[in-house]
Amino acid sequence: MALTFDDLPFVAAGQPYFPAATRTTTELLQVLRRHRAPAIGFVNEGQLDAGGERRRDRDALLQQWIAAGMTLGNHTYAHRDFNTQTIEAFQDDIIKGEPTIKRLMAAKGSKTLFFRHPMTHTGETKEKKDAIDAFLSARGYRIAPHTIENSDFIFNVVYVRALAAGDRALAGRVREAYVDMTITATAFAEKTAPALFKREIPQTLLLHANVITAESLGDLLSRFESRGYRFVTLEDAMADPAYATPDTMVSTSGPTWFWRWARTLGVRLNPEGDPEVPAWVMEAYRRATS
């Protein structure tokens, strides 16, 4: 299993950026090292320019990832939805999103660059999708897929607000639901791979650099290990031939690559077991973000 983290350096979710960002980064990296798990973090360069000036304290968070032996990828500068952007505007945001990750990865000696679309929206028209695919390839990027997602950004908002309100009982309930959904999503991915490829494949998990993931990661990795997983780099996971299957999906949504590959292969997947965020969590999220 490859572990991927979006929206680096940190997803504040309404709380003060520091000291939560430092605490979360440290906790994530400690857990990853403890489990000997490589990971890649996808960076929003715009977070480093908060307030109209370069934030060295935020740069330092990325340096922690590099010092821990992790990889960094491009997640654009401003995390804008490709569905709402022109091809040219999105290309500009990709270019603006690459200076820091290119510098840090070059210093690390890495020649492979990865890109993940914000919200994994890869193009709602064939023209836009094909144009950005070609643009990324020309700039030396590989598009980062994911086969497991757990909507951790939704759980995180509710979790952070519960902690801020001192409601430890609610926070515990949210965290338990989050872990349960992640394991259920993993089981669905394990069932889906053989339906497409007649065998198991390396899974790729999409997470975010946020509080709930940091505080749940140790539990999650232990559960993955008990299911027989070992942790590999994204590059190693993508060496499996399944990942060479083209993504031909044109959509406003950003589903996992299993649904995209199914479209390419002409296979109708059974959605049974594909989990949804519990209704009570979604309602709390809507209240918090409305």
How would you describe each model-predicted region?
Residues 1-120, 205:
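Active-site beta->alpha N-cap acidic-glycine motif
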Residues 26-29, 59-63, 130-136, 218-221:
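Short amphipathic alpha-helical segments and helix-helix/interface helices
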Residues 36, 145, 199, 209-290:
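C-terminal domain-boundary segment and adjacent tail
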Residues 43, 76, 147, 235-236:
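Residue-level recognition of beta-strand->loop/alpha-helix junctions
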Residues 55-58, 86-90, 158-162, 245-251:
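Short low-complexity, flexible loop/linker segments enriched in glycine and/or proline
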Residues 66-74, 100-105, 167-185, 256-277:
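Short, basic, helix/turn surface patches
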Residues 68-69, 137-142:
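Glycine-enriched alpha-helix->loop->beta-strand junction motifs that scaffold or abut catalytic
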Residues 80-106, 125-139, 147-199, 213-216:
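Alpha-helical scaffold elements lining the catalytic groove of polysaccharide deacetylases
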